Amino acid sequence: MEPFSSKSLALQAEKKLLSKMAGRSVAHLFIDETSSAVLDELYRVSKEYTHSRPQAQRVIKDLIKVAVKVAVLHRSGCFGPSELALAARFRQKLQQGAMTALSFGEVDFTFEAAVLAGLLTECRDMLLELVEHHLTPKSHNRIRHVFDHFSDPGLLTALYGPDFTQHLGKICDGLRKMLDEGKL
């Protein structure tokens, strides 16, 4: 027989409730204005690249669900010492990816899709390892979906191409602000 834990039960209920409500209103509870603006631009890029509104909505919804669930796990103190160390390494890798994306956006002729895709793949693998024992396989698939979508070399090449200059500029502005404020 499993021991009863009201904290565990409350956490399960919170995650279940949040998974049903991962829309704009809930996102604003966990995601600030700058992050929201970056997510909106990522949605526009995905929509233009895939020519599919539902596909773009799905990837951003999955991203929000994952971000909210990881935030809930972190705030609830569910991560042990080794997981917190992994979370710190994940954050550093994410920051490295953001700085690389900024560098590619600011310095002409430096963009390499393989470098950015590699960083995103490393982030995906670290996040999957971090939440392995805390989230369901469905959430693991969401993580794969989000990172695989944004690490697609075709999408990255399009993002750094002439047709997406405006979107890239807004994404870079948001990433720079998030890095400066320590929110990434």
Swiss-Prot record:
Q: How is it modified after translation?
A: Ubiquitinated in a BTRC-depdent manner; leading to degradation mediated through the proteasome pathway.
The protein's UniProt keywords, in alphabetical order, are: Cytoplasm, Immunity, Innate immunity, Lysosome, Nucleus, Ubl conjugation
Q: Does the keyword Chaperone apply?
A: no
> What job does this protein perform?
Acts as a negative regulator of innate and adaptive immunity by maintaining immune homeostasis. Plays a regulatory role in the Toll-like signaling pathway by determining the strength of LPS-induced signaling and gene expression. Inhibits TCR-mediated T-cell activation and negatively regulate T-cell function to prevent hyperresponsiveness. Also inhibits autolysosome formation via negatively modulating MTOR activation by interacting with RAC1 and promoting the disassociation of the RAC1-MTOR complex.
Q: What is known of its domains?
A: The central region was initially thought to constitute a DED (death effector) domain. However, 3D-structure data reveal a previously uncharacterized fold that is different from the predicted fold of a DED (death effector) domain. It consists of a large, hydrophobic central cavity that is poised for cofactor binding.
Q: Which family does it belong to?
A: Belongs to the TNFAIP8 family. TNFAIP8L2 subfamily.
| Identification of the protein by name | Tumor necrosis factor alpha-induced protein 8-like protein 2
Q: Which organism is it from?
A: Rhinolophus ferrumequinum (Greater horseshoe bat)
